[in-house]
Every structure is written in C-alpha cells, then in structure tokens.
Amino acid sequence: MNKACHFNTQELLKVDEAVKVSEELINNYFKMSSGQWLKNRYDIKTAKDLADHENVEGPFAQVIKYEGRKKDATLGSSSFSFYKVCLQDSAILSAVSKTDSLFLEPFLLYILTHELVHVVRFLKFKQRYENKNEADVTLDEERRVHFITHKILKPVPILRLNQVFEFYKDWILFEKS
C-alpha cells in the first residue's frame, strides 16, 4: 500500500465536515444526545495519524477496539471499550479518482456514517467485536450495517449521494426480518 498518499489540507477539511454531519445523523438516528457516552468512546483518525497496524489494504476504513482506563484507575472494572475509526486515505482517494461518479464529500459521509453505525452497534452490544479488521466482519453483519447506513442517509439532501448508493448497490440489500 502506498503510505505516502494522505489527505491534503483541503481534503482534511472535507473529512472534518463529514465527521460533523455523520455524528449528528448517528445521534439523531439512534436517539442519542451529544452528551451521551458515545462522544468519549471513539475517535476518528486519518492515515497520517495511524500506527502501522492500523493501516490496512482493501477497506476504506476499519474500526479497532482498544481498552481504555481512566488515569489512576487500577481495577479492571474501571476499564471501558474505546473504538478508533481508522480512515484509509489512500484507498478512499484511489476509489474517488478511479470512479468518475464518486465525489469525495458524499463518499466520506457514507464511509464515516457506516463506521459509526458499527461503533454504535458494538457499544450497544448489537454486534460483537471480536474481529481484527473490517474484512473479518461477517457478510450478513456488513450488509446489515450498509442497510442502516442507507436508511440514515437516504432522506439527507446531499449532492451526489445517490452515486455513492449506486457504488454500494450490491451491499445495500433489504434487511431480512
């Protein structure tokens, strides 16, 4: 993987905006207030801030679980799950450059919303975290998360978002009851 390919300053501004919008959409969809537990239980990083093991080939992002503990806490009962959303700049930029119909802003919004759906499902125990990376997540679970992501984003009037839905059309299937 080409580790030299990172988001530039303008692209990072687009990432920041997509993070804000996706967080708001996630909070609204899952009926969480901005002050609830989710705010401090995850972080979003781009390639330049990732450790070597957090960079992967293939997916556009991955969620990695870490164990957090408050300062001066020695008991295991004081630990908590902390999730890091690791954006893979190179894969995202490559997909956008190779696919005429994809534009960075709506693509980032979809990716970030998708990853935050995973985080919420992990934190609410709707999905078990026992996988090392996104590629290990079961196909059924991945399709379920794409379905939820589509459900969250469909009513949002974002220019060129339909092209992103088209890009993911094989993943966005109706959820089985």
What feature does the model see in each segment?
Residues 106-107, 121-151:
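Post-HEXXH active-site segment of zinc metalloproteases
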Residues 1-80:
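A metal-dependent hydrolase signature that marks the N-terminal structural subdomain at the beginning
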Residues 91-112:
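Short pre-active-site segment immediately N-terminal to the catalytic Zn-binding motif
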Residues 91-96, 135, 140, 161-165:
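Conserved binding/catalytic microenvironments
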Residues 111, 115-123:
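Catalytic glutamate of the conserved HExxH
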Residues 86-92, 122:
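Short loop/turn segments at strand-loop or loop-helix junctions that form parts
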Residues 78-87, 115-116:
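Short coil-to-beta-strand
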Residues 2-9, 16-20, 150, 154-177:
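Long, well-structured alpha-helical subdomains associated
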